[in-house]
Curated annotation (Swiss-Prot):
Molecular function in Gene Ontology: mRNA binding; translation initiation factor activity; translation initiation factor binding
Protein name, entry field: Eukaryotic translation initiation factor 3 subunit B
Predominant cellular place of this UniProt entry's protein: cytoplasm
Pfam families (UniProt xref): eIF2A (PF08662), RRM_1 (PF00076)
Keyword tRNA processing attributed: no
Location in the cell: Cytoplasm
InterPro entries named in the record: EIF3B (IPR011400), eIF3B_RRM (IPR034363), Nucleotide-bd_a/b_plait_sf (IPR012677), RBD_domain_sf (IPR035979), RRM_dom (IPR000504), TIF_beta_prop-like (IPR013979), WD40/YVTN_repeat-like_dom_sf (IPR015943)
Gene Ontology CC, one term: cytosol
WD repeat copies, ranges: 207-246, 293-331, 334-369, 442-484, 530-575
Species, as recorded: Drosophila melanogaster (Fruit fly)
């Protein structure tokens, strides 16, 4: 064919001397090709579609209980209930032996192949009971394993990626804290800056454009910062905040870290409700997932302080899962009829929960020890409308705020319940005392806020009318009823923010943007009353030395930014930042020093004062020197620019004279200058004479 084509071409254009005859690629007569199609086109043949044999939607379930015919129906109900959660099952086969006893495996056919794949993914290694753990595989996997090549090829060696020190932020010799500031630069585009709170001016560590779509969140110990994106979330850390791990969960709206930072919980919407996934942070592996109905609220999981257990509330039950397997504790839920709420102790494996009133049975608050599931304390309550559980951070006390009523009004069908004559009780459980005694404080006014002192024995309450409320401080001591130590009257605050170290508290009105700083040691003196109009957030730093108030663009669009104060309310810094979103201090891990060592340091603290003061003076001197040098450099730059412009102006003098009719206007004197003296009041002082 090539030769014929060249002949035709040469016949039509014999004068084309540049034309070269094409080579002949025809095989010689009798040629036999010894290369197979698999060797020649193996990569393409591997992708060719194969004829479906109808078993893609079949799964094989191994390690099921071997039961007699009389128990087979019950077994089918249990297994069908599990596997039907992932799709419609069209056929099930349980092979049996000669005696009719099941052989320990079964075949299940789903309506669609993707349903079978989902069932394998979710139920493989599912623990049915202590003696039976499912091994679930696709039927087509047998064919895949049959075709394993006999010649083993070693896996390619992956280079080891050295991870930077995740705890370098606590190695600063001066122990300066870090914080992050987020600001929206475009829709779904948030810039995040990381700063170190050094003196006299904060130092910028890193700034990332388009770092997150919405907001960021620190992990409890400050090791990681999490960012939100359409495909899922990612965590960052190290000295330069490089990516540590990513977790694919589209549409994630909220995340929770476990207290020891071993696990991450992501919450994302689905057409039928919320999908919740628990991840292993170090490996990025999905440990377990849940689908909650649309009525479920965020943060439905509660972690124990040591990451050994995670719990969630179900209908008339608590589900407690053990880590790292995430199987139910003792393979069953704890049945608690009428349960309405629960909470873990922040320092011990103790769960507090409360049960509503039912059929003339009083409401009840119970403390349960885990994993023994032993009830260590009960408290019956009457005429209860609602309860809130408040643990003190040190785990020494539990306060149960009880909303009580004098009269209950129901309609004919009991669909609408109204509580009349409301009053409130605070039940204080002394967790460190023998038999856990309980004290009660009753208040007849509306309760607006409650807050424990994190490391002390005091708690504070806002009660009364919204615009003219009272703030009461109570002290809890062993063997005596909680005593009222101070009441600040006619305050317009809505929230209470204790310092992480105790003693100081900020009473905030997050509607008006007013704040009062109170020292709870010296007769509860108000040390300062600054204003920050429209402020919607208050953040204490981990050391309790600084407080930040912020006006977020989520609330308003003008005058957004943040103010920084000392713990006594003295303003340090005002920052106006367009489209400011959030300010977050970086948390610190707990100290490695023992309590005895900490007490020794506090006892001998005066020895360190001289060294600290000298260091502060040197720092301020150095800062003053740097400031003077900076000002001097700015002055030199300005004078250089000024002299340059003066010389340029002098060079243009002849041009100016020519343009102005040969009149030198530079030296003309004029009487058209008017001087006006304006006086205004700067300050007025009034002195009373006796």
């Amino acid at each position: 064919m090539a030769k014929k084509k060249s002949e035709e071409h040469s016949g039509t254009d014999a004068n084309d001397s540049d034309y070269q005859e094409e080579p002949n690629f025809d095989d010689p007569p009798g040629f036999v090709d010894n290369i197979s199609d698999e060797d020649l086109l193996g990569d393409m043949l591997a992708q060719r579609p194969s004829e479906a044999d109808g078993v893609e939607s079949v799964v094989v379930v191994d390690n099921i209980p071997k039961v007699e015919p009389v128990r087979l129906e019950k077994l089918k109900l249990v297994i069908n209930k599990l596997f039907s959660n992932y799709g419609e099952i069209v056929n099930v086969v349980y092979p049996v032996d000669e005696e009719g006893k099941t052989k320990g495996y079964a075949f299940m056919e789903y309506k669609q192949a993707r349903q079978a794949e989902e069932a394998v993914k979710k139920l493989n290694n599912h623990r049915l009971d202590k003696n039976h753990t499912f091994a679930v595989n696709l039927f087509t996997d047998f064919q895949k394993y049959e075709n394993i090549p006999e010649k083993w090829e070693p896996p390619t060696v992956q280079t080891f990626k050295v991870q930077s020190d995740l705890y370098n932020f606590i190695n600063d010799p001066d122990t300066y804290d870090q914080y992050c500031v987020a600001a929206e630069t475009a829709p779904n585009c948030v810039q995040v800056g990381f700063w170190q709170n050094v003196l006299p001016e904060p130092f910028e560590l890193e700034t990332r454009e388009r770092f997150t779509d919405t907001f960021v969140k620190w992990s409890p110990l400050g090791t990681y910062v999490v960012t939100f994106h359409k495909p899922g979330v990612a965590i960052w850390g190290g000295s330069s905040f490089q990516k540590i791990q990513k977790f694919p969960h589209p549409g994630t709206q909220f995340v929770e870290f476990s207290p020891c930072e071993n696990y991450l919980v992501t919450y994302g919407p689905t057409p039928t409700g919320q999908k919740i996934i628990i991840w292993d942070i170090r490996t990025g592996a999905e440990k377990r997932s849940f689908v909650a109905d649309g009525m479920s609220v965020l943060s439905m999981f509660r972690w124990s302080h040591d990451d050994k257990f995670v719990a969630r509330m179900g209908e008339n039950s608590i589900h407690i899962y053990e880590t790292p397997s995430f199987y139910l504790l003792d393979l069953k839920s704890i049945k608690i009829p009428g349960i309405r709420g629960f909470s873990w102790s922040p320092t011990d494996n103790v769960i507090a929960y409360w049960v509503e009133e039912q059929n003339q049975i009083p409401a009840r608050v119970t403390l349960m020890e885990i994993p023994k599931k032993r009830e260590i304390r009960n408290k019956n309550l009457f005429h209860v409308a609602d309860c809130k559980l408040h643990w003190q951070k040190s785990g020494d006390y539990l306060c149960v705020k009880v909303d009580r009523y004098s009269k209950l009004k129901k309609d004919k069908k009991d669909l609408d319940v109204k509580f009349l004559g409301m009053f409130y009780n605070f039940e204080i459980f002394h967790m460190r005392e023998k038999e856990i005694p309980v004290d009660s404080v009753e208040i007849r006014e509306l309760i607006l806020a409650f807050a424990w002192e994190p490391v002390g024995n005091k708690f504070s309450i806002i009660h009364g009318e919204t615009n003219s409320s009272n703030v009461s401080f109570y002290e809890v001591n062993k063997g005596v009823k909680p005593s009222l130590v101070k009441r600040l009257e006619k305050k317009s605050c809505t929230h209470l923010f204790w310092s992480p170290r105790g003693q100081f508290i900020v009473m905030a009105n997050l509607t008006m943007g007013t704040f009062e700083f109170v020292d709870s040691t010296n007769d509860y003196i108000i040390t300062a009353s600054p204003d920050h109009f429209r402020a919607s957030e208050v953040e204490w730093d981990p050391t309790g030395r600084y407080v930040v108030t912020g006006v977020s663009s989520w609330k308003v669009k003008e005058d957004t930014g943040f103010n920084m104060y000392t713990f006594q309310g003295r303003i340090i810094k005002r920052t106006i930042l367009k489209n400011f979103v959030q300010f977050l201090w970086r948390p610190r891990p707990p100290t490695l020093l023992s309590e005895e060592k900490q007490k020794e340091i506090k006892k001998n603290l005066k020895k360190y004062y001289a060294a600290f003061e000298q260091k502060d003076r040197l720092r301020l001197t150095r800062a003053s020197k740097e400031l003077l040098e900076k000002r001097s450099q700015l002055r030199e730059t300005f004078m250089e620019y000024r002299n340059k412009r003066i010389a340029e102006w002098a060079e243009q003098k002849s041009r100016r004279i020519m343009l102005r009719g040969h009149v030198d206007t530079d030296n003309l004197e004029t009487d058209e200058v008017d001087e006006e003296i304006v006086e205004f009041l700067v300050k007025e002082e009034v002195t009373l004479l006796e």
